[in-house]
């Protein structure tokens, strides 16, 4: 039987360093204070950031609202400009002067149509006013009929009153306004805008056709308008 002998030298008990209880308590307190300080600092920082964010959002919202209002106004102005440019391009595509230079009959018909439109516009405006005042319009119609006949417009005489055969609206206005209305319908909902675009169409048409009257005996649209306006004023001024 083998005898086992244990030597005490092989087993050494190492001394374990221990921290006093009071020192551990102090460390815990310091750590808690540090954590609390960090927490308070974080809360304060979060609050400041939140206030800044809200302030920035309010400023941004106000600026955005102001920008949108300005953009809306700019967009309206821009759209009016675009519509007018489209109408001008449409008129250029019609090439009234180019066609008139190639076709004398077309040039003659264009002049007659323009002057007849001037006649109709002045007649309607003055007759409406005279009728509203209970004035007989027959003498006025007779006199402006004679003016139209003297201007070289073809027509017919009925009940001693000459009426141009082409009397009516300017034939070039409708194509311009209609084409713009089809392309930009949202711009023609307002009656004021409709009237504005119609006036613009008449203006650019008169500018376009003016050279057609340079070498003919017929008065220009502006001259014919003044002739009819003077006749109308004579009757209007005599109204009570």
From Swiss-Prot:
- UniProt-annotated stretches for the region GEF catalytic domain: 78-240
> Where, per UniProt, does this protein localize?
Secreted
Q: Which Gene Ontology biological process is one annotated for this entry?
A: actin cytoskeleton organization
Q: Does the keyword Secreted apply?
A: yes
Write the record's keywords in alphabetical order, separated by commas: GTPase activation, Guanine-nucleotide releasing factor, Secreted, Virulence
Question: Which Gene3D superfamilies does this entry report, sorted A to Z?
Answer: SopE-like, GEF domain
Q: Which InterPro entries match?
A: SopE (IPR005414), SopE-like_GEF_dom_sf (IPR035949), SopE_GEF_dom (IPR016019), SopE_N_dom (IPR016018)
Q: Which stretch is the leader sequence?
A: none
Gene Ontology, cellular component aspect: extracellular region
Protein's UniProt keywords contain Lipid metabolism? no
Under the heading SUPFAM superfamilies, the entry gives:
SopE-like GEF domain
Q: Which GO terms describe its molecular function?
A: GTPase activator activity; guanyl-nucleotide exchange factor activity
This chain's function reads: Activator for both CDC42 and RAC1 by directly engaging these Rho GTPases and acting as potent guanine nucleotide exchange factor (GEF). This activation results in actin cytoskeleton rearrangements and stimulates membrane ruffling, promoting bacterial entry into non-phagocytic cells.
Assigned protein family: Belongs to the GEF (guanine exchange factor) SopE family.
Question: Further notes on this entry?
Answer: Encoded within a prophage region, which is only present in very few Salmonella isolates.
Protein name per UniProt: Guanine nucleotide exchange factor SopE
| Species of origin | Salmonella enterica VII
Q: What lineage does UniProt assign to this protein's organism?
A: Bacteria, Pseudomonadati, Pseudomonadota, Gammaproteobacteria, Enterobacterales
């Amino acid at each position: 039987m083998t005898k086992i002998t244990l030597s005490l030298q092989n087993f050494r008990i190492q001394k374990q360093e221990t921290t006093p209880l009071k020192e551990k308590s102090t460390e815990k307190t310091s750590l808690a204070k540090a954590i609390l300080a960090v927490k308070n600092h974080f809360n304060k920082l979060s609050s400041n950031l939140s206030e800044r964010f809200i302030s920035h959002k309010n400023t941004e919202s106000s600026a955005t609202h102001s920008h949108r209002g300005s953009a809306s106004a700019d967009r309206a102005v821009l759209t009016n400009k675009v519509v007018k440019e489209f109408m001008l391009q449409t008129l250029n595509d019609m090439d009234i002067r180019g066609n008139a230079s190639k076709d004398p009959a077309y040039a003659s018909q264009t002049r007659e149509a323009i002057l007849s439109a001037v006649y109709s516009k002045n007649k309607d405006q003055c007759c409406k006013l005279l009728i509203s005042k209970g004035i007989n319009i027959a003498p006025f119609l007779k006199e402006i009929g004679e003016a139209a006949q003297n201007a070289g417009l073809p027509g017919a005489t009925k009940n001693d009153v000459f009426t141009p055969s082409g009397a009516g609206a300017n034939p070039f206005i409708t194509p311009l306004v209609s084409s713009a209305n089809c392309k930009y319908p949202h711009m023609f909902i307002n009656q004021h805008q409709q009237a504005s675009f119609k006036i613009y169409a008449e203006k650019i048409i008169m500018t376009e056709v003016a050279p057609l009257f340079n070498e003919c005996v017929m008065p220009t649209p502006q001259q014919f308008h003044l002739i009819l306006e003077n006749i109308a004023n004579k009757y209007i001024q005599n109204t009570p």
